Swiss-Prot record:
Function per UniProt: Possesses antifungal activity sensitive to inorganic cations.
InterPro entries: Defensin_plant (IPR008176), Scorpion_toxin-like (IPR003614), Scorpion_toxin-like_sf (IPR036574)
Record Gene3D superfamilies: Knottin, scorpion toxin-like (3.30.30.10)
UniProt-recorded name of the protein: Defensin-like protein 1
Cellular compartment(s): Secreted
Keywords: Antimicrobial, Disulfide bond, Fungicide, Plant defense, Pyrrolidone carboxylic acid, Secreted
Modified residues (Pyrrolidone carboxylic acid): Q1
GO BP field: defense response to fungus; killing of cells of another organism
Disulfide bond sites: C15-C36
GO cellular component: extracellular region
Amino acid sequence: QKLCERPSGTWSGVCGNNNACKNQCINLEKARHGSCNYVFPAHK
């Protein structure tokens, strides 16, 4: 399981196989991808 601990930070839960993290990053943070570290793509 991967934690969504990225600097953009509206999600503090666990990135599972569901779309919760993806949707929140895309919908609320205007991310291009579902990855929650879209602000710093090289920082994981």
